[in-house]
Amino acid sequence: MTMTLHTKASGMALLHQIQANELEPLNRPQLKIPLERPLGEVYVDSSKPAVYNYPEGAAYDFNAAAAASAPVYGQSGLAYGPGSEAAAFGANGLGGFQPLNSVSPSPLVLLHPPPQLSPFLHPHGQQVPYYLENEPSGYAVREAGPPAFYRPNSDNRRQGGRERLASTSDKGSMAMESAKETRYCAVCNDYASGYHYGVWSCEGCKAFFKRSIQGHNDYMCPATNQCTIDKNRRKSCQACRLRKCYEVGMMKGGIRKDRRGGRMLKHKRQRDDGEGRNEAVPPGDMRSANLWPSPLLIKHTKKNSPVLSLTADQMISALLEAEPPIIYSEYDPTRPLSEASMMGLLTNLADRELVHMINWAKRVPGFLDLSLHDQVHLLECAWLEILMIGLVWRSMEHPGKLLFAPNLLLDRNQGKCVEGMVEIFDMLLATSSRFRMMNLQGEEFVCLKSIILLNSGVYTFLSSTLKSLEEKDHIHRVLDKITDTLIHLMAKAGLTLQQQHRRLAQLLLILSHFRHMSNKGMEHLYNMKCKNVVPLYDLLLEMLDAHRLHAPTNLGGPPPEDMSQSQLATSGSTPSHSLQMYYITGEAENFPTTI
């Protein structure tokens, strides 16, 4: 048998022919769709050179002749890439696979059929570093791009995002925890370093008060004893700074009555407060309830408040004990009264009475069961009515005169020195005469004053929310309790049932006159402020602005022209800053009654 000899080239061609015949049933014709318009910019024209720049600065020419390129599979079914049968397998062996003793630097990848995307655009804007060349010798793959093109797994990115979100939320919760502990100095409104001499104060005001009570404190104000004390101007006037220290409640003892007893008593009180919060606040509202200052947390539910179980005698005793102390004015009888001097005396006296009024309100039974916002709002609405009923009560024994303080007794003629004051004087004198005719008793007076406080803003700030409805119901229950106490006093005095009803109606009708006088007084005080007759104190000024915002004339109408947007933002929706600061830190029972 004769064996035909073949050269190496003819032998390889024969081998390729045999393999092509065996694989011919598997081949399918390539479907070619004619293009209706020219290729876009993202497609490659094989007739043009293609050079692509990578971020690392290396340029790759994909139309250059590739030496020893690895073939790849096409995407159309099981067929190999288009081209001649011999070229479909490349030049390196069967099916284009690398020999076992060689390692290809390029991976075997699956690519799109022609027309091919020039380099394939990833949705995230990254370019895939594999590219198919259309050469006469067959399809080949260029080497993969630099390792810098490696794209992280999407799951890893999501996990990293979740970790960043978790760390951000942890930082946010830590920031909120630290914000809840932020306290401000009651004197200058700087950051407080601790609880010193009975109030939260900074190191500077603490040291100043310590030096003042230990050494000489005969400070003299170079102005009118009305200097503003804040963070930037606290060192400008020592006299006014010391006066403000006393006004906010600083005392020589340095320990409040409810803080005596040492560390064990402090821990016991904290445990009691925690138990009270758990009873009063639902679990879902615990986080929001902790934002309020601890002395004002509600410790009892409204329906189970111990105030509602008080007897009439216990209610009277509590109201009498809550009465504020007597305050003296700065009146100098040797100096004649003028418009500026009289308004200065009255505003100074009112400003100091406001601080004592805050302490009195907190001792009214049932008042502390309300939220902080509602307590401050009631005070903002009723403060001038409360001052006026106290003035009328003190003036009952002085017909034709008004007793503003034990050392300040004014008649109608003296009120003429202030423009517009005579009308208010006449109304106050008429109400005092009415009290005198009715022979108003001290127990009835304290009940009427408490009714003014609780009834002043109950219909102006409560919304239809469940919490507001609960507050409204609680206020009405306390008002009913005080009304029952009034009836008990009348019955105890020996009045018949008909006389009790008549006297109760007469007393309650007088309260409407106090509301009318209060509105007149607010208008007059506001006019004096606009005329710059007298500089108002910070607390009195904020109370005046808050009352104007709560007044019915401003509901739905434009705000006062002289108020800035920041004042509207703070006063309209939240309690006044100065009043809230006095409310939380002020201890009026320790204030001096004279200056």
Curated annotation (Swiss-Prot):
Cited InterPro entries: Est_rcpt/est-rel_rcp (IPR024178), Estr_rcpt (IPR001292), Estr_rcpt_N (IPR046944), NHR-like_dom_sf (IPR035500), Nucl_hrmn_rcpt_lig-bd (IPR000536), Nuclear_hormone_rcpt_NR3 (IPR050200), Nuclear_hrmn_rcpt (IPR001723), Oestrogen-typ_rcpt_final_C_dom (IPR024736)
Glycan attachment points: 10
Annotated 17beta-estradiol binding sites: 353, 394, 524
Zn finger (NR C4-type) location: 185-205, 221-245
Phosphoserine: modified positions: 104, 106, 118, 167
Segments of the chain annotated as binding DNA: 185-250
Location of the region described as Interaction with DDX5 in the Swiss-Prot/TrEMBL record: 35-174
Region (Required for interaction with NCOA1): 35-47
Record-linked SUPFAM superfamilies: Glucocorticoid receptor-like (DNA-binding domain) (SSF57716), Nuclear receptor ligand-binding domain (SSF48508)
Its job: Nuclear hormone receptor. The steroid hormones and their receptors are involved in the regulation of eukaryotic gene expression and affect cellular proliferation and differentiation in target tissues. Ligand-dependent nuclear transactivation involves either direct homodimer binding to a palindromic estrogen response element (ERE) sequence or association with other DNA-binding transcription factors, such as AP-1/c-Jun, c-Fos, ATF-2, Sp1 and Sp3, to mediate ERE-independent signaling.
Name used for this protein in its record: Estrogen receptor
Source species: Sus scrofa (Pig)
